Amino acid sequence: MANILSVRGLSFGYQGNQVLRGVDLEIPQGSIFGYLGKNGAGKSTTIKLLLGLLPIEEGEIFFRGVNLREAPLLLRSYSSSMIEHPFFYPFLTVSENLDYLDHIFRLGKGRKKEVLSLMGLNDHANKRAQSLSSGLKQRLGLAMCLFNHPEMLILDEPLNALDPQGIYELRSILKMLNQEEGVTIFLSSHILEELEKLADHVAIIHGGKVIYQGDISGLIKKQSNIVKFKIDNTSIITQLGYDSKFSLVEIHDANHVSFEIRNENEFAQLIALMSQERIAIYNITYQESALETAFIHLTE
């Protein structure tokens, strides 16, 4: 799959504070690409550089193979963005907001009807934007973004301020846009559980550097799973010589212990070792690694 956007060696600082330190990104065309990081990691700064809202100090950004140093507004010509909050005119109705865009882009009333239907806004067309729920405001913001047929959507924390129903609806809409409309979606987020359900590629930024980039399944497979069980006395565990094969995570108390294991075979071997040493075990729980576990492990 070809890359629609490539970032190479991108660095940026504010008043002596270095925010980005040689960031490299490869965003495949047609993907949903999740950009993960803690607050202050550099996600929003990266997005502002992509959109030409900040000058490129060091490094290069290529969109469709063209260096944005030579064409700084190219990405903005073929993409739409929603940064922090959806853009619309609050005192206009949903329909009037789209009429305004039609006046700019001259795509005809047919496009307005398409976007209203696509975003499920037909029943809300005559409502003032300021009266909409948070979820509907996000839909209107996306409708505004989609009006000019962008190849790519760039969204900064789009799941913020949404309730669980709103998150579910937005996730469904983004998947539909990607799968049915062919829109490449680049979004930053710290809501890892939802991003795991949505994105097919991720990059993790920490301390201004990208520390992982690839598909989610590959990231999770690199992480260990956790098995926890109860035994009669955890003091025997320290005498076992398990260290070469199994990693002890924690002795929780006199009766509970956790181990880190990489696969089901190691799980079976650990249970066999307990049996061989005549250690009775109870209440076994097996926690598979998830995106959140991997993220915490990489950024701690």
Model-derived regions, located:
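ABC transporter nucleotide-binding domains
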Residues: 5, 12-206, 212
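Short phosphate-engaging motifs
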Residues: 19, 108, 194, 235-237, ...
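ABC transporter nucleotide-binding domain
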Residues: 171-261
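C-terminal coupling/interaction segments
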Residues: 262-300
